[in-house]
Amino acid sequence: MKSDTQVRAPTPKVGKQATAVTLGAFLSGAMMSLSAVMIPVVLQTNDQADQLLKQWALLYHYGHIIMPSLAILTTSLYAYIAYSKRAVGHQDWSAYAKAGLTTIAIVPFTLTIMEPTNDTLHELSRSTGNSLDIVQGLIVKWVWMHTVRSVFPMFGSILGFRGVLKECGVYSK
């Protein structure tokens, strides 16, 4: 006969953590889709440099509005979680701090690694009569850098997910 007085360990509340992990994964996927789907379509369907530059500039414009905002939101959520856990002496707060730092790493990567290429593409988009080969080469270079940048939020999500698994007692390292 089963006892009705069995004691269960309390289920950890991980709603904020799950939201941060999901946002980071969504951000990474949205960013990666530009490199894996959108830019190849644009490259394969344009035979005029000026049109290609116009499309890239619009893609950059809308991406610049959405992606940094998602990165800041995700990082802020990770920072809040890390701070809250550290304030009460929770030993696994650093997993969320690392997840946030990894996610926001897209900003310095953009400013140090990608900005020269971004600036060149923007400068070319304001002129006419550009070489298709040069523009395609710059956009392919941009795609590779953007692909690398897209991985940062995914690594952040993995680190955050490990933190969630630790809290739930599923992962012990």
Swiss-Prot record:
Signal sequence annotation: none
Subcellular location: Membrane
Homology family: Belongs to the anthrone oxygenase family.
Enzymatic class: oxidoreductase
Reported function: Anthrone oxygenase; part of the gene cluster that mediates the biosynthesis of an emodin derivative that may be involved in black Sigatoka disease of banana. The pathway begins with the synthesis of atrochrysone thioester by the polyketide synthase PKS8-1. The atrochrysone carboxyl ACP thioesterase MYCFIDRAFT_190111 then breaks the thioester bond and releases the atrochrysone carboxylic acid from PKS8-1.
Top-level division of the source organism's lineage: Eukaryota
Inducing or repressing factors: Expression is positively regulated by the cluster-specific transcription factor MYCFIDRAFT_198930 and is up-regulated during banana leaves infection.
PANTHER family associated with the record: ANTHRONE OXYGENASE ENCC, ANTHRONE OXYGENASE-RELATED
Keywords for the protein's UniProt record, in alphabetical order: Glycoprotein, Membrane, Monooxygenase, Oxidoreductase, Transmembrane, Transmembrane helix
Transmembrane segments: 23-43, 62-82, 93-113, 138-158
Membrane topology: Multi-pass membrane protein
Organism: Pseudocercospora fijiensis (strain CIRAD86) (Black leaf streak disease fungus)
Main location: membrane
A Gene Ontology cellular-component term: membrane
EC code(s) of this entry: 1.10.3.-
Pathway: Secondary metabolite biosynthesis
A Gene Ontology molecular function term of the record: monooxygenase activity
Name listed for the protein in its UniProt record: Anthrone oxygenase MYCFIDRAFT_34418
Annotated glycosylation sites: N118
Catalytic reaction annotation: emodin anthrone + O2 = emodin + H2O + H(+)
